[in-house]
């Protein structure tokens, strides 16, 4: 039976994702906190927080789930030509806080942001502890795009991306894919499908299939230098 769980500030196990509501799709639990231990446990089990500034903490595990299988991100001929012309350079874990702030900037036709100060503080702590990571896109010394997310074994859980110049966020995800393949990752969890993700090659799969993949890869190791702050190169 589908049911909604209420969490308190005592650390406790999450309910099974299979108990998540169908309307709204994937809502599993309310409450708790954003301590690193709770967040890591959530992602380890295919659950993530998503809530507005005035809401309690909401925990989700939607069905279907959007994922990118590595090597399957779609790079159109026109995008490839465009990116080759840009004087951009790319880094890993050089400006995590600035990337989160960029992702939190208001979007067209969007009121506010779910990347609240509380969320930013929690994920900065995860970054300091070696769990959350960023890709940066630069033009000179100006940050023009990027993305951030969490690494759970061989799975990268993408959280958000942003751009201040056309196609900069697409460049970030292409760089991310290239980096993850080289370091032994298997897939990107993109959480909820939308037209932008679909245009890049994301697939919507059943939650049960996603949990199977997550269980298969979440305890496996990747290359030890995967997240050392460094410059990376776009290969087209």
UniProtKB/Swiss-Prot annotation:
EC annotation from Swiss-Prot or TrEMBL: 2.3.2.6
Origin superkingdom: Bacteria
Cited Pfam families: Leu_Phe_trans
GO cellular component labels: cytoplasm
GO MF term (any one): leucyl-tRNA--protein transferase activity
Catalytic activity: N-terminal L-lysyl-[protein] + L-leucyl-tRNA(Leu) = N-terminal L-leucyl-L-lysyl-[protein] + tRNA(Leu) + H(+); N-terminal L-arginyl-[protein] + L-leucyl-tRNA(Leu) = N-terminal L-leucyl-L-arginyl-[protein] + tRNA(Leu) + H(+); L-phenylalanyl-tRNA(Phe) + an N-terminal L-alpha-aminoacyl-[protein] = an N-terminal L-phenylalanyl-L-alpha-aminoacyl-[protein] + tRNA(Phe)
Coiled-coil region(s): none
Any one Gene Ontology BP term: protein catabolic process
Predominant location: cytoplasm
InterPro entries reported for this sequence: Acyl_CoA_acyltransferase, Leu/Phe-tRNA_Trfase, Leu/Phe-tRNA_Trfase_C, Leu/Phe-tRNA_Trfase_N
Keywords: Acyltransferase, Cytoplasm, Transferase
Location of the protein in the cell: Cytoplasm
Family: Belongs to the L/F-transferase family.
Free-text function comment from the UniProt entry: Functions in the N-end rule pathway of protein degradation where it conjugates Leu, Phe and, less efficiently, Met from aminoacyl-tRNAs to the N-termini of proteins containing an N-terminal arginine or lysine.
Protein name, UniProt field: Leucyl/phenylalanyl-tRNA--protein transferase
Name of the gene: aat
